């Protein structure tokens, strides 16, 4: 078995203790200023000081050496919350929002998510596949090596299944590890505008069984927000999804403190996402339940809202993950580097905390930490080489990509 030895590199990585990094642990990185990484069959065999890794390499088979040129090495980014499967951008609504129209007002008038629903219904499956694959490849160029993609622009059984099929095709054809999430309860379609309860019943009785039969989605999500789906409606849907074997996620407390974070804690969801308006009480409940907070600072940036209180969450030992929320309405970016910069500059996270949030904790938010998210022995050799002395360059050097190279399972892919 041949080995690859990546040497002459400064390594920075969170280390996996078997659980998400919370509290002070989120800010701790392993650092090897004269580091090396030994890879076999796409998996990490050894990582650490170059001399120690060389000793391991000499005891094995033939070794191919790769000189990293003194560059900084970090884990590949894991993006645990995206809506990359969509048919058309929404630039006109961007102009409306800049002029002062609120996101929820646009939605109530049939725009927003409902505009994307109409576009997906009109799009052919191949067209949707090509545009989604392009966005995934763009994310890869910025250093993302694993990500999640949600459905949610279908809102009927046929189009939700179409979106999941597209996500499944992209997962096969892309080199990234891609996780699909079913988000049938993303908005209330027109025919159910006055009866959201009936729509939830339809999802539970018709959509969910078909989603389970299709076998592509690994999680179920719901937009739990005033004017969309209530706490009780969200509870009914998520409990049904859990009974069908799906992991749970919640769009929680993005606009108002409805209590979605508390519901995530009650149900033992894998993550609660957004959380701009989450209360101290529900943040503590998330901590006690081990729910990961997936924060989306690019959305707050785009909507010109206050940012989620990452510092409060970290101080309460909630593991914080970071994601792009890439979507055509409120966060059109594929760049985890941009997200890290916003987290450091606007959410008071340290560069080390942000890197952990964009890698290890994000992997836990997708139940993927057994194979990605850190440079631990036995995990996939998914890593980045940076143009900079430390990971702080990701926030410090704004407006450019600091990623020199992207490796997936030990192979250079960008």
Curated annotation (Swiss-Prot):
Looking up HAMAP family in the UniProt record yields:
HutI
Protein name per its UniProtKB record: Imidazolonepropionase
Q: Where does 4-imidazolone-5-propanoate bind?
A: 90, 153, 186, 254, 330
Q: Where is the composition biased (Polar residues)?
A: 1-20
| Keywords noted in UniProt | Cytoplasm, Histidine metabolism, Hydrolase, Iron, Metal-binding, Zinc
Record-linked Gene3D superfamilies = Metal-dependent hydrolases, Urease, subunit C, domain 1
Q: Where does N-formimidoyl-L-glutamate bind?
A: 153, 327, 329
Per UniProt, the cofactor note for this protein states:
Binds 1 zinc or iron ion per subunit.
User: Where primarily located?
Assistant: cytoplasm
What does the protein in this record do? Answer: Catalyzes the hydrolytic cleavage of the carbon-nitrogen bond in imidazolone-5-propanoate to yield N-formimidoyl-L-glutamate. It is the third step in the universal histidine degradation pathway.
Would you name any one GO CC term? Answer: cytoplasm
Concerning its family, UniProt says: Belongs to the metallo-dependent hydrolases superfamily. HutI family.
- Using the UniProt annotation, give all residue ranges assigned to the region (Disordered): 1-26
Mind telling me which InterPro entries this protein's record contains?
Amidohydro-rel, HutI, Metal-dep_hydrolase_composite, Metal_Hydrolase
One short Pfam name that applies is: Amidohydro_1
Q: Which cofactor does it need?
A: Zn(2+); Fe(3+)
- Compartments (UniProt record): Cytoplasm
Keyword Membrane present in the record's keywords: the answer is no
Q: Which reaction does it catalyse?
A: 4-imidazolone-5-propanoate + H2O = N-formimidoyl-L-glutamate
Q: Which residues bind Zn(2+)?
A: 81, 83, 251, 325
Q: Which positions does UniProt annotate for Fe(3+) binding?
A: 81, 83, 251, 325
Query: Which biological processes are named by the entry's GO terms?
Result: L-histidine catabolic process to glutamate and formamide; L-histidine catabolic process to glutamate and formate
Superkingdom, according to UniProt? Bacteria
